[in-house]
């Protein structure tokens, strides 16, 4: 899911860039991980021909992910839809808005349980979700457990509260919420798509982008009613944008996005206009509410979702593997691989302090 055709547009205009890690030695870069998006992507890419059971393949896939994160000096904060165990109910966001719109139209399909997010590739093994989550918990990694939010919204919250520097996912609707994305961490220089580069390419500010490209959101529109990014971009061509304006608009990362988000509603056609479906307006209202800091006296505060980090415990890692793999020898082998290649992660608060405070001070010298 995401913005229909954005990756194609981004590659055509060379907006997907290889990024060198620029933090000082010993400083980890905090990033949000859209867990199931990333795991399914790795499963499809590397485990099509596996003959091992699903639990073993899940463990090996997670091990691959954690090793890549460690090599790139990333500190992951794991995020998933409907809480870390996936047993909540989404009450806000694009999927909830679309479900409510479908129910209002009298389509009973909205009352059906959500379809599992699954690979279209025939031989891709299934992920054992409970095993994956328990390994993350017992290895001592940080995660977010908010049962009524989509992963995309949690990632956007972490990004705009200056908790994470980027979001690792292939869901391009993160750009619509003003976030920078890591598309692939496997290359030595990870592939990154930045919101400000997309805006500069289109010659729009964030409010204009949100108002115009919401019609490309595949969670809000069903084919063939969804527009592609290229279609909308072509409709914007011919507008003159002074070079100095572009420079001013995209000089910073977050403040302009927070400031401009609320203007998007004023750019939409009037409520009730057929050119502005209700779902689009409600989604933009949701994004504005999500990105706008609340006023507390003379302060503006954007609250961060709570982060959980449990102590690492090798016995619980082995127990989780044994429970799902059901082969003691293989469970011991896998537990040994995790403990050999993945050092226990540091406290997330220390990581954030080192990156956002100490690292910024280092850059100013």
Swiss-Prot record:
A GO molecular function term, named singly, is:
endonuclease activity
Could you identify this protein by its name?
Virion host shutoff protein
Does the record bear ATP-binding in its keywords?
A: no
Q: Where in the cell is it found?
A: Virion
As for what it does, the entry says:
Minor structural protein that acts as an endoribonuclease during lytic infection. Degrades host mRNAs in the cytoplasm by cutting them at preferred sites, including some in regions of translation initiation.
Q: Which gene encodes it?
A: VHS
GO CC terms of this entry:
virion component
Keywords in alphabetical order, please: Decay of host mRNAs by virus, Endonuclease, Eukaryotic host gene expression shutoff by virus, Host gene expression shutoff by virus, Host mRNA suppression by virus, Host-virus interaction, Hydrolase, Nuclease, RNA-binding, Virion
- Family note: Belongs to the herpesviridae VHS protein family.
């Amino acid at each position: 899911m995401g913005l229909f055709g954005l990756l194609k547009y981004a590659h055509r205009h060379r907006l997907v860039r290889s990024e060198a890690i620029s933090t000082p030695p010993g400083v980890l870069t905090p990033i949000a991980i859209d867990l199931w998006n990333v795991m399914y992507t790795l499963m499809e890419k590397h485990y099509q021909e596996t003959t091992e059971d699903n639990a073993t393949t899940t463990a090996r896939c997670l091990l691959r992910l954690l090793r890549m994160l460690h090599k790139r000096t990333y500190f992951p904060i794991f995020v998933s839809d409907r809480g870390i165990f996936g047993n909540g109910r989404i009450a806000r966001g694009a999927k909830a808005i679309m479900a409510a719109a479908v129910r209002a139209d009298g389509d009973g399909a909205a009352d059906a349980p959500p379809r599992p997010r699954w690979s279209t590739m025939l031989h891709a093994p299934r992920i054992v979700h409970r095993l994956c989550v328990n390994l993350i918990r017992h290895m001592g990694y940080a995660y977010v457990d908010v049962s009524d939010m989509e992963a995309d919204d949690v990632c956007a919250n972490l990004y705009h509260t200056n908790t994470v520097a980027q979001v690792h996912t292939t869901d391009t609707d993160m750009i619509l919420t003003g976030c920078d994305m890591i598309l692939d961490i496997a290359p030595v220089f990870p592939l990154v798509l930045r919101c400000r580069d997309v805006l500069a390419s289109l010659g729009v500010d964030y409010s204009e982008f949100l108002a115009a490209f919401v019609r490309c959101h595949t969670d809000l529109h069903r084919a063939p009613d969804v527009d592609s990014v290229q279609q909308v971009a072509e409709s914007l061509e011919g507008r003159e944008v002074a070079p100095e304006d572009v420079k001013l608009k995209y000089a910073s990362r977050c403040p302009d996005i927070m400031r401009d988000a609320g203007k998007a509603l004023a750019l939409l056609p009037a409520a009730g206009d057929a050119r502005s479906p209700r779902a689009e307006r409600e989604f933009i209202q949701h994004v504005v509410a999500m990105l706008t800091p609340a006023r507390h006296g003379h302060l503006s505060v954007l609250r961060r979702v709570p982060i959980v980090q449990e102590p690492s415990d090798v016995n619980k890692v082995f127990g989780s593997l044994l429970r799902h793999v059901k082969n003691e020898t293989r469970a011991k082998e896998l537990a040994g691989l995790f403990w050999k290649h993945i050092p226990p992660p540091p406290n997330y608060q220390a990581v954030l302090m080192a990156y956002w405070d100490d690292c910024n001070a280092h850059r100013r010298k």
